[in-house]
Amino acid sequence: MEAVYLVVNGLGLVLDVLTLVLDLNFLLVSSLLASLAWLLAFVYNLPHTVLTSLLHLGRGVLLSLLALIEAVVRFTCGGLQALCTLLYSCCSGLESLKLLGHLASHGALRSREILHRGVLNVVSSGHALLRQACDICAIAMSLVAYVINSLVNICLIGTQNLFSLVLALWDAVTGPLWRMTDVVAAFLAHISSSAVAMAILLWTPCQLALELLASAARLLASFVLVNLTGLVLLACVLAVTVTVLHPDFTLRLATQALSQLHARPSYHRLREDVMRLSRLALGSEAWRRVWSRSLQLASWPNRGGAPGAPQGDPMRVFSVRTRRQDTLPEAGRRSEAEEEEARTIRVTPVRGRERLNEEEPPGGQDPWKLLKEQEERKKCVICQDQSKTVLLLPCRHLCLCQACTEILMRHPVYHRNCPLCRRGILQTLNVYL
């Protein structure tokens, strides 16, 4: 126990020293940062101060110019006002002349008005006769309209009486039905209200019991969580102390625990289940696709050749690729001789094509065969499906399609190599043929 106390006291002393060093470091760094912040604020505000002084100087000059302009404007306004007074006196003389003209025009208008009155008297007498004739016609038309209105009112009153009779009959028929529906609705409402009251009466004790259980669980959880940290710290301190003072005892405990774990049949069953799941995962179709794609990317240097060299037959390459994809789960157990044989099978179509091209005379070749070979040369060297549309830089090899280039560029930088010359790919360029 004394050794435990010594270790605990030593740890406390070390923590105090570390706290003191951290406080001194924080004080020094904070003072240095404060001085740097003050210096930066001074340097930062110096241009602003200079600009503010220049701005105030410009404002003073601008205000003096505005005062000078205001004096000039006021002087100009006084001159214009005097000129306007002179013009107003001239206008008064013109007004007197205008008054004389108005007097002459008034005399002419009065004479014309007298003439118009005579003409209007003649016209008004004719208009009175015409108005009397129109009144007679209006009285006759009003009598005719009264007769027609009376007939229409009689028809409307008869129709209204007929509709009121039909409504009375409908009310007499549907009234009892509505009363029956009201009684049924009131009965159902009474039953539902009594059921709700019974449910509330039964729910109150259940709610009290649930609240009591929740409060007890909350109290227990708070007690466990408060004491859990202390228990964990005590267990950690005891484990470290036992490990430091008695390492042999710790090793014996570990070996005994491992032996007991290996002796349990459940451990072996769990291990067998994990191995079976790993075999199923490795034998799945998705894992086969991923493994075949990785093997295709790894076999690029074996597929490549010089730029423009004829590639192997697509059907043979596809058959070899299918065979390799079917044997992926047993790839870890295949020998080196089988891998060498598969590599030889993959490279054989290319060499056979080159040998046939060397044996055939230049003049006796079939043009359709040449065209087919030319189309095959345009295919991607990896998938043998799409056309070559991407130029690799700086090696300048046109050998990949867009999809294979995207898959290649997803790899790390040190794996981005040309499949023909194995040089690093720094940039790609799309080519449209």
Swiss-Prot record:
Chief site of localization: endoplasmic reticulum
Effect in UniProt of substituting residue 401 to S: Strongly decreased E3 ubiquitin-protein ligase activity. Impaired ability to mediate ubiquitination of TMEM173/STING
The keyword DNA repair belongs to this UniProt entry's keyword annotation: no
Keyword Endoplasmic reticulum on entry: yes
GO cellular component, one term: endoplasmic reticulum membrane
UniProt-reported outcome of changing residue 399 to S: Strongly decreased E3 ubiquitin-protein ligase activity. Impaired ability to mediate ubiquitination of TMEM173/STING
Annotated membrane topology: Multi-pass membrane protein
Subcellular location: Endoplasmic reticulum membrane
InterPro entries: RNF26_mRING-HC-C3HC5, Znf_RING, Znf_RING/FYVE/PHD
Catalytic activity: S-ubiquitinyl-[E2 ubiquitin-conjugating enzyme]-L-cysteine + [acceptor protein]-L-lysine = [E2 ubiquitin-conjugating enzyme]-L-cysteine + N(6)-ubiquitinyl-[acceptor protein]-L-lysine
Residues that span the membrane, as ranges: 24-44, 60-80, 147-169, 183-203, 220-240
Protein name stated in the entry: E3 ubiquitin-protein ligase RNF26
